[in-house]
Curated annotation (Swiss-Prot):
A motif ('HIGH' region) lies at residues 12-20. Catalyzes the attachment of tryptophan to tRNA(Trp). The gene is trpS. Homodimer. This is Tryptophan--tRNA ligase. It comes from the Bacteria. Belongs to the class-I aminoacyl-tRNA synthetase family. InterPro entries: aa-tRNA-synth_I_CS (IPR001412), aa-tRNA-synth_Ic (IPR002305), Rossmann-like_a/b/a_fold (IPR014729), Trp-tRNA-ligase (IPR002306), Trp-tRNA-ligase_bac-type (IPR024109), Trp-tRNA_synthetase (IPR050203). Keywords: Aminoacyl-tRNA synthetase, ATP-binding, Cytoplasm, Ligase, Nucleotide-binding, Protein biosynthesis. PROSITE patterns: AA_TRNA_LIGASE_I.
Amino acid sequence: MDKPRILSGVQPTGNLHLGNYLGAIRSWVEQQQHYDNFFCVVDLHAITVPHNPQTLAQDTLTIAALYLACGIDLQYSTIFVQSHVAAHSELAWLLNCVTPLNWLERMIQFKEKAVKQGENVSVGLLDYPVLMAADILLYDADKVPVGEDQKQHLELTRDIVIRINDKFGREDAPVLKLPEPLIRKEGARVMSLADGTKKMSKSDESELSRINLLDPPEMIKKKVKKCKTDPQRGLWFDDPERPECHNLLTLYTLLSNQTKEAVAQECAEMGWGQFKPLLTETAIAALEPIQAKYAEILADRGELDRIIQAGNAKASQTAQQTLARVRDALGFLAPPY
């Protein structure tokens, strides 16, 4: 029996941080043997907002190398670059032509980012969810790992599938597969070190708001030392008046691979002066093997290029099958080759 297929990806917009790792990538690694996995570096998504063309290519390689360093296993998973598979752009256009504009205008993430960009907001940012839908649908994904902030985009993908299948498919022969969300509640939202009510993000202007996977020990120590806390003694979870306390305890729980109950007992009587060195030591120990593996991978650039090339080829072969099916359903003349 074929394994269910998963599709997910990360933008190459700077270093990955603990939010990316604990909220997504680590769960991919833990579950990968149960699925047929396609993990993408979504560089086309990265240019929907202002980006640095001088660093995009290197950032793309960094994300691919970090996938491997974090434990993505090529026995179970395919790693590829989104822009290297032309079918993503073509399917996105075909989906655009059947997706109502008002579906996109109600997307919460677009509204939030459009406010920041003002008149300079791009059509690409508005259309981001349709490209995401193309990413998912090209690979007939059964499951899509999503955080709470991406659930609306996956719901849009499902709406697009239903619309296309109703218009162009048959009940016994749908054009596109309807994907299901794969939501991991524990650690799904790792919050900022500077504000426990905001998600840890690469787009935050302050480097002190996040711990990057490639941060050296001294930088981790500095960031934990400066992270926002409160004056209370004793540490506990789930207090809405202490969001930073809950966030830092959650980080320690995930990085130390302990249960919430064990951490609650261990830290109940601690002050921040005792807890912060403990969190620092735990974060450094958790990231050391990832950083060592990353350095090993980058030391053999040729092998990394071969991995990406092989992944691109496999992804393209799979994607072309779906694209041909959609083109046929929409009535296009098949190319004579």
